[in-house]
A protein has these predicted regions:
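Active-site proximal loop and beta-alpha junction motif in alpha/beta enzyme cores
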Residues: 1-18, 23-142, 149-213
Length: 213
C-alpha cells in the first residue's frame, strides 16, 4: 500500500500533472506531521513514487523516461509532466515570460500546453534553468520535473550513472539517474531542500482542517 496520495492543483484551479517539487514538499509535510518512514511510498497522477528525507534534503524518485524527441534546437520529453527544453547562452537576460509563452501557445503545443525550460550549460557541467509553467502561465522559481527534464537532455555520460547539479531561481537541486545504451533513463532521483514557509488553518464546508506548509 501507499503512505498517501498526492493530488496537485495548478494556480489556475485545475488538477495538474506531476509536480516534482510539490512531491518533495508533501513528503516533507508528511515527515513533519509525524508519519515516520525510512522511505515513503505515495501515489501521484503519473504513478508510484518513492522518497526519503535525510539531513534536511528530500529525495524523490521520478518515473522512468523511455524516449526524448529531439529536433535541431530543442527537445521534448515527459518526466511526469510534458517539457520543452532549449539551450540558451545568456539565461540571466532572457525574457522567459514572453519567450516561454510564445512556445507554450504555439500551434504545436497550445491545445494541451507544455512547460518550457531554458537551460544554460555551465563550464563545470552544471546547469542553470528557468521555466515557464503551463497552468501558472508565468515563470516560476523552480520546477522539479523541468529540472529533471533538463538534466536528462544534458547528460554527461552516454551510458551509466549521471549526476547533474542545477541552479534555479529558488535555489539548488540535484538530479541523478542511469542512462541506458538504448537511450532510456531509469533510477531518476530529484533531490533538494524543502523548507516550511508558514502554518495556517482554514475551514471548508464546516470541516475544520489544519493546513501546514
Amino acid at each position: 500500500g501507499y503512505d498517501f496520495e498526492m493530488v496537485y492543483y495548478n494556480a489556475d484551479g485545475r488538477e495538474g500533472s506531476m509536480c516534482g517539487n510539490g512531491g518533495r514538499c508533501i513528503v516533507r509535510f508528511a515527515h513533519d506531521i509525524g508519519i515516520d518512514r525510512s522511505r515513503f511510498t505515495f501515489l501521484a497522477t503519473d504513478g508510484e513514487h518513492l522518497a526519503d528525507v535525510k539531513d534536511g534534503l528530500v529525495s524523490l524518485k521520478m518515473i522512468d523516461v523511455n524516449y526524448i524527441n529531439t529536433s535541431d534546437n530543442y527537445s521534448v520529453l515527459n518526466t511526469g509532466s510534458p517539457h520543452y527544453v532549449k539551450q540558451v547562452d545568456n539565461l540571466a537576460n532572457l525574457d522567459v515570460f514572453n519567450a516561454g509563452r510564445e512556445i507554450r501557445y504555439s500551434d504545436a503545443f497550445k491545445e494541451e500546453g507544455i512547460n518550457v525550460n531554458f537551460v544554460e550549460v555551465m563550464s563545470d557541467g552544471s546547469l542553470k534553468v528557468r521555466t515557464y509553467e503551463r497552468g501558472v502561465e508565468d515563470e516560476t522559481f523552480a520546477c522539479g520535473t523541468g529540472a529533471t527534464a533538463a538534466a536528462l537532455v544534458f547528460y554527461k555520460n552516454e551510458e551509466g550513472f549521471n549526476t547533474v547539479d542545477i541552479e534555479v531561481l529558488g535555489g539548488k537541486l540535484n538530479v541523478s539517474y542511469n542512462r541506458n545504451a538504448n537511450g532510456t533513463y531509469n533510477d531518476i532521483w530529484l533531490k533538494g531542500p524543502a523548507v516550511k514557509v508558514y502554518e495556517g488553518e482554514y475551514h471548508i464546508q464546516d470541516k475544520h482542517i489544519i493546513s501546514k506548509a
